[in-house]
Amino acid sequence: MQSMKRFLLLLLVLVSCTPLATPGRPDSSQTAPAPRLPGMTSSAFVELAGERVYFESGGTGTPVLMIHGIGAGNSSHLYRNNTLALSKAHRVYAFDFPGFARSGARAIQYTNDLYVAVIEAFIRSVVREPVQIIASSYAADYAIRLASEQPQLITRLLLSNPSGYGLDLDSMTLFGGNASRNPERFKQFADTPLGTLIFPVLNSESGINFFLYYYVYLDWRKATPEVTRIYLENLEGPNKAYAPFSFFSGLLDQPIDAYWPTLTQPVHLVWGTDDVFNPITEVSLYLEKRPVPLTILRARAIPYEEESEKFNAVALKFLR
């Protein structure tokens, strides 16, 4: 399942951007664009763990950090149907991971360790107090690890479709090949023509639409031209291929078997009925090791967007 996910997302990124390398230190002096998420009133760039990170914030109340999952064209825009409702009761923060959307992108290997470090640094440097986290997919895995390692930083976890339970990085294979977590494979994508071989296979707009129709949304009508445009905009600019290259090479995987049972914070799981990559059957792995409340919504990969009103109601009831 993880291999299929990487393959599909790599296809999309290769038809949507070129792997032009412009290495160097991040520039935090750039003026931030206006916030695009409803309810957010400010935006800024901040340097965290050596990377330039774009974030938005708004609202008043106890802090809530919303963290997007990993995928070509992903960003904090995935929470556009949630931020307004939550900002009426909480101080809401949302950032783009390094390598994605408005955050800086460099010609480097991105890793799960880096992204966990970015979350920790954001809480310590920007929020500056313990925070409640809403996270999806891989970001949920990172949040679980951080909540276990640094429990004083995180008070509650509302997690959608996490993906890291049962991962064995030593034995995973990619289409029957070598171990999935493979820095050498990243170098093949980044430094040789292999990374652009699939570029002409799909038209970028149609390729993204295919992915949205069949893997992201259960109701394909929600994959509007405006949504497609946002994904395309998020892929504009140099070095936007390197985070997906890292993903495809297994460098962003985060096993959580050792972390999940040790969590001391209140946790609420939300799962889509028809998620292709993280099927609903996987929820039993989590509940067997640590029983927590579960909400199932009619959706694929992003129940917080497809069923946003129901998700927002769950969030407002769970968060403190």
Predicted regions and their residues:
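Alpha/beta-hydrolase fold catalytic core
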Residues: M4-L65, K88-H90, R128-E129, L319-R320
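Conserved HGGG/HGGXW glycine-rich cap/lid loop of the alpha/beta-hydrolase fold
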Residues: E51, S57-R102
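Active-site loop/oxyanion-hole signature of alpha/beta-hydrolase fold enzymes
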Residues: A94-I134, Y138
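Short glycine-enriched nucleophile-adjacent loop
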Residues: A140-P151, L157
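Flexible "cap/lid" loop of the alpha/beta hydrolase fold
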Residues: S148, L157-L197
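Conserved alpha/beta-hydrolase catalytic His-Asp/Glu region
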Residues: G195-P261, Q265
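Conserved loop-alpha-helix segment in the C-terminal half of the alpha/beta-hydrolase fold
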Residues: T262-A299
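Catalytic histidine-centered segment of alpha/beta-hydrolase-like enzymes
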Residues: A299-N312
